[in-house]
Amino acid sequence: MPAHVVTPPSLGRSFVPNLWDIVALVLIVGVMALVVYGGEQINVPLSALDNPAVSLDPWNLPEYALRTTLRMLTAIACSLLFTLVYATVAAKSRRAEMVLIPLLDILQSVPILGFLTFTVVFFMSLFPGRVLGAELACVFAIFTSQAWNMTFSMYQSIRNVPKDLEEASRSFHLSAWQRFWRLDVPFAMPGLIWNTMMSMSGGWFFVVASEAITVGNSTVTLPGVGSYVALAIQQRDLAAIGYALLTMLLVIIAYDQLLFRPIVAWANKFRFEQTSSGNEPTSWVLDLFRRTRALRALSVPFDAVTHSISNWQFRMPWRWPRGVAPKWLSRLLDVLWVLGIGVGAFYVGWRIYGQLSETLAFADVLNAVGLGLITLTRVVVLIALASLIWVPIGVWIGLRPKLAERVQPIAQFLAAFPANLAFPIFVVGIVQYGLNPDIWLSPLMILGTQWYILFNVIAGASAFPNDLREAASSFHLRGWRWWVKVVLPGIFPYYITGAITASGGSWNASIVAEVASWGQTQLQATGLGAYIAGATVSGDFPRVVLGITVMCVTVTLFNRLFWRPLHAFGERRLRLG
């Protein structure tokens, strides 16, 4: 009896397009047309921008939404590439980790306006007189608001790969390249996807600051939802703010349905478990493409290419065999590496000291450190309160995939809500009731960053192995014991990632949140953020540098002394497998 040959695309079915092919093709062509149209708008001369570039006419919002979304998707793609490289090197190399992770702590705490100050001139000089230079500067600013939490998530996942899976990869003699694509990336996928969602939502807050590019004495305003919101706030036009929020909601629903929900449903196969979960996430877009014939047939060559790339045998031409390298050589390299880091840190500190000592006294440093401790207290209290609220809610959502599907766009919209739109409510309330700004301006710091905790806890609960839940049920673990013995240890690494990024984001937001204004009314809280904001407005560059330096040092020390020991505890004691 002749053997039956199974065709790869559709198990022997006809290649004739069906109705689903037509629908999918229309969807693909429509998205590509929008991308091409948006791409054409970024390669025009600066003089081609309308004056004014942004109008509060709501009929312009569809085009503004398209251009802002393309900028954010471009930044997400760059953030993903950065994450795959940076997080992997930090997780795999002990010596690189000593530099890269503290550097990441510093980068996420540096205000986004600090990046804009140094990068706008560079990107504008690459394409002088073209809109593309301003677009790249805007994309880079959005990138700095998206990349850090994705990198922390990937780093945490690689460091917590189950030991039995590591042993299996060694027994199959996988190269480092093969292990990366077959083990590290799949295991990191749940957390990375939810952090990518958070990055997209968090980017909405920063487009308000990044779509108005200042070069010298001139300002280039790029058409987009962010610049629309900034103009609406400036003119105190509540109707325009409402139109912008509605546009944001529609855009979030669109990319949730077309991008994130299909990815979540597709990535469900990477869950680390031995039994099938009862309720799996679904996506009508993914189901649509799975029902096509011609498109699936056309995708076979691409699948073959990606499969062959993931199987490449990248190996070092020569290296010390495992366990053969002399111990003295390893120790010598460690000493030289630490010495190099110390010399570099001393040089940077000396240069900063040389710049500041000419204009500032030691009392100024003590004042900045004291203000930093006040802001640190705010951050710690707010992170603790946000954890008490969002950890139980995140676990409840993450363990129910169907509920997570419904909550997903709502959570993305809440995370995308620009915190500066809440300033009028807080300012009016504080003035009306005579409240203390030092206390009641503090929630503005966590308004946009609390979602890092929620999204990471949802990711951890979503990736929680179903067989462990069944084992807990068979042992009749309920109530407090279920939380302490089962769920909290399972989501702990994800929570730490969310808390670290929320903490760093809160430091960044303190510059905006500790000084809130609406119209002619301005309120100020005591803290390092208000110190930096005041120095920036007055043009006091030495105090700006001092404030940012104190902020970076405080964040790094706090992460080293508090968050990193907790992260190491999770790796050592709460690792699956």
How would you describe each model-predicted region?
Residues 120, 137, 141-161, 167, ...:
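Transmembrane-helix bundle segments that line or gate the permeation/cavity pathway
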Residues 81-86, 93, 100, 137-140, ...:
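Membrane-embedded alpha-helices of multi-pass transport/permease systems
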Residues 75-104, 382-411, 424:
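Transmembrane-helix boundary motif in ABC transporter permease subunits
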Residues 1-77, 245-384, 558-577:
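N-terminal, non-cleaved signal-anchor transmembrane helix
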Residues 105-145, 412-449:
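Generic hydrophobic transmembrane alpha-helix motif, especially the helices
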Residues 205-238, 508-545, 550, 574-577:
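Glycine-rich helix-loop "coupling/hinge" segments at transmembrane-helix boundaries
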Residues 177-210, 243, 259, 443-447, ...:
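Transmembrane alpha-helices
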Residues 153-192, 456-497, 532:
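Short cytoplasmic-facing helical segments at TM-TM junctions of multi-pass membrane proteins
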